[in-house]
């Protein structure tokens, strides 16, 4: 029976062609870091500082999701931890299963995300294994990083700024099939070329924090900061603060 390890081994060999990737068998299951809906109440009455993610996070096999239009299945070579991951794992400020339920009600395709488990993680660097209908910019074998914003782009409000789209969500936090796993499901418009000079780990680290800092501080719809401005960065030691 095929498993994901043969895919990762092929990629790491360094001499695998796109045709080789296309011919690899994608298994019907993979391993991921996940939360279980049955554990939602495990920290009830426990102070935030005493909630231990090691008690809620599980490493388990889950079914490989079917690809929908505009989506890509990625072999994850590296991922990253951020506050979304911590919040998810301690069910604060709310359980992420509420996000999955609400998302699942929006369309038959989104219903795939409403499951009794949640594969989390909002960063990755990896290799495109398969693409869904309508994806033309990416093909199997492409090395990519994924940013965290999952957006439907059906509302005109998001055409100028996707942060204003009423259906924008954080992938792996408000959606399922996140990056802390062997495989991940993303929208193809989340993908960017992996910089060739970066390792997998280096490429996987900045996605969420870098894009968040840029959007909020530098972009025309953010604070409009520019070189030479004198600013105070509150909490500058973390990932987001460091990029800020």
Segments and roles (model prediction):
Residues 7-24, 40-78, 83, 111, ...:
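A short N-terminal beta-strand-loop micro-motif at the entrance of redox/enzyme domains
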Residues 26-33:
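Short structural boundary motif marking the start of a folded domain
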Residues 92, 151-161, 175-188:
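A structural motif shared across PLP-dependent enzymes of the aminotransferase-like
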Residues 185-193, 197:
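Structured surface patches comprising rigid loops and adjacent beta-strands/short helices at the edges
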Residues 198-244:
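Mid-domain Rossmann-like dinucleotide-binding core that forms the NAD(H)/NADP(H) cofactor-binding site
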